[in-house]
């Protein structure tokens, strides 16, 4: 949407009413053959469906390429938007209910997950553990020959308000999204 709207600072409800936007979205999505309930399902569908391209997270492009390469098939080329990325950062949260034992367990888990060893293991799965590149030790996972840019500094887009996000999702679900392939 940002690109179709000329890269505003942030998408607003008013910008969703821009003349011609609906037609541009329809044209853009006309090339979508299948949609999926999750990014991992989409990767699996791509690997079994004989499709030519996939829009997905960097880590799932890497995962798909690892499988394609193991099967001796042509790998995907990663393409990054030049004007900003939507980043899935999966934060870890804790609700303090006054239980010191549970809080300590949470803090221990957090310390473990943030340890160099575990951060390295996470990076080995093709997931970045920070905004500024990857460790030299994991350069073989983030492969330039697949178009992966390990030294790219991630520049996130500014997310719209919750209300505007809900409006965007509603529009997508009701006006633009092709039905899922459902088999009973």
Question: What is each of the regions a protein language model found here?
Answer:
Residues 52-57, 93, 182-183:
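Structural recognition of the beta-strand scaffold that forms the well-ordered cores
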Residues 97-182:
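Extracellular/periplasmic juxtamembrane helices and adjacent flexible linkers that interface
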Residues 4-80:
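Ligand-binding pocket segment of bilobal, Venus flytrap-like solute-binding proteins
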Residues 1-2, 6, 107:
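Residues on a specific face of well-ordered alpha-helices
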Residues 2, 88-93:
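Small-molecule pocket liners
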Residues 29-32, 95-99:
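Second-shell loop/turn segments in exported
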Residues 6-7, 59-62, 83-86, 97-99, ...:
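Solvent-exposed loop/turn segments at secondary-structure junctions
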């Amino acid at each position: 949407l940002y690109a179709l709207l000329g890269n505003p600072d942030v998408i607003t409800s008013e910008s969703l009413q821009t003349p011609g936007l609906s037609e541009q979205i329809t044209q853009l999505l006309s090339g979508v053959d299948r949609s999926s309930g999750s990014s991992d399902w989409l990767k699996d569908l791509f690997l079994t469906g004989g499709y030519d391209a996939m829009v997905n997270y960097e880590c799932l492009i890497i995962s798909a390429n690892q499988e394609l390469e193991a099967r001796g098939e042509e790998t995907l080329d990663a393409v990054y938007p030049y004007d900003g990325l939507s980043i899935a950062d999966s934060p870890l949260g804790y609700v303090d209910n006054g239980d010191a034992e549970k809080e300590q367990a949470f803090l221990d888990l957090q310390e473990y997950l943030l340890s160099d060893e575990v951060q390295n293991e996470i990076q080995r799965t093709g997931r970045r553990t920070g905004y500024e590149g990857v460790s030299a030790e994991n350069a073989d996972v983030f492969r330039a020959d697949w178009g992966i840019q390990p030294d790219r500094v991630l520049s996130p887009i500014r997310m719209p308000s919750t209300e505007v996000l809900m409006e965007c999702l509603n529009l997508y679900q009701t006006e633009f999204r092709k039905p899922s392939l459902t088999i009973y």
